[in-house]
Design a protein with these regions (language model features):
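FMN-binding flavodoxin-like domain, especially the glycine-rich phosphate-binding loop
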Residues: 3, 13-16, 20-36, 43-151
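Aromatic-flanked redox-active Cys/Sec active sites in thiol-based oxidoreductases
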Residues: 7-11
């Protein structure tokens, strides 16, 4: 199985989660991890599973993640399974407007992808982090569960 993990990260927290997820997915096949600033549309060619993650900013994914998904050709993800994640803070106002991962999921479905599991969020202690204790382990376990479900 060919797996691609695409992420954006401002302070390194989402990058840490992306790498933990890639580690957990390693049991399912060949995993590539690509920061959105280095991602190309051709990176999706031939993949079976796409994982996309972003910090939550203004109740959405980063502009770079949004633009990447928007620029994918229609139906370019047909036959590709996907999961999404975000990093987020505990905050009543943010909770009211929502988080990045469900919005990323909607964009990927619009390009033909099929969801494997519900979008997930990983907690940071503040705007710049760090990650809350146990989140890296939770990310690895989340990815292992996806990998096992796809076997």
């Amino acid at each position: 199985m060919k797996i691609l993990v695409i992420y954006d990260s401002q302070y390194g927290n989402t990058e840490q989660i992306a790498k933990a997820i890639a580690s957990g997915l390693g049991i399912a096949g060949e995993v590539r991890t690509v920061k959105i600033s280095e991602a190309k549309l051709g990176d999706i060619t031939g993949i079976n599973l796409l994982i996309v993650g972003s910090p939550t900013q203004g109740a959405n994914a980063t502009i770079a993640i949004q633009e990447f998904i928007k620029n994918l050709p229609d139906n370019s993800l047909k036959g590709v399974k996907y999961s999404t994640f975000d990093t987020r803070m505990t905050n009543k106002i943010i909770r009211m407007f929502g988080y990045a991962s469900p919005k990323i999921a909607k964009g990927l479905e619009g390009k033909g992808a099929t969801q494997t599991v519900q979008p997930v969020g990983f907690w940071v202690k503040g705007r710049k982090g760090p990650l809350k204790e146990g989140e890296l382990e939770r990310a690895t376990k989340w990815a292992e569960n996806i990998a096992n479900a796809l076997k």
